[in-house]
Regions:
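Zinc-dependent deaminase catalytic domain
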Residues: 1-164
Length: 164
């Protein structure tokens, strides 16, 4: 039996050695057809041209996990139609003592994901809840930036990749 895409992303998030200065650890896993295409993690003290272009907070001094995942493959793979699963966990999170929290992509990350054609973002809300953001039909804010609404929220047990 195949693992759900959310479980796969949680495993990647728990296996990574994060910078000790980070209060929360964020992992973004891009999937196409149920296969892992790229994995990105938040890092402290770095920035990227892609992130500078889209950022909404001038004081942000880290690469966000979603941006890192896109940067890893943006010149190698067409991400149109892909999904991203974003997991945020506290440092003392474990399978026996889960501490998953809100990982909704920020406005900057939403714009990056939309620009590269990703269709959906699934993200943790709590240990037992997740949100789903449709990235294909944006509203525009007063600055012309895309903004997306969540269309579902539910139990983590239903996060199978329905495209397979």
């Amino acid at each position: 039996m195949r693992k759900r895409i959310l479980d796969v992303a949680i495993d990647y998030a728990r296996d990574h050695k994060y910078d000790r200065g980070l209060a929360a650890c964020v992992c973004a896993v891009i999937f196409i057809g149920g296969r892992v295409i790229s994995v990105g993690y938040n890092t402290k003290g770095r920035d990227s041209g892609l992130q500078r272009r889209y950022r909404t907070n001038p004081h942000c001094c880290s690469i966000h996990a979603e941006v890192a995942a896109v940067l890893n493959v943006r010149r190698k793979i067409d991400l149109t139609g892909a999904k991203v699963v974003v997991v945020r966990r506290f440092r003392d999170d474990s399978a026996k003592n889960p501490k998953l929290v809100m990982a909704r992509p920020c406005a900057m990350c939403q714009a990056v994901l939309y620009s590269y054609g990703l269709k959906r973002a699934v993200y943790t809300i709590t240990n037992d809840e997740y949100g789903v953001m449709n990235l294909t039909d944006p509203r525009r804010d007063d600055k012309g930036n895309p903004s997306f609404d969540e269309n579902t929220s539910g139990d983590v047990s239903s996060t199978h990749d329905e495209d397979e």
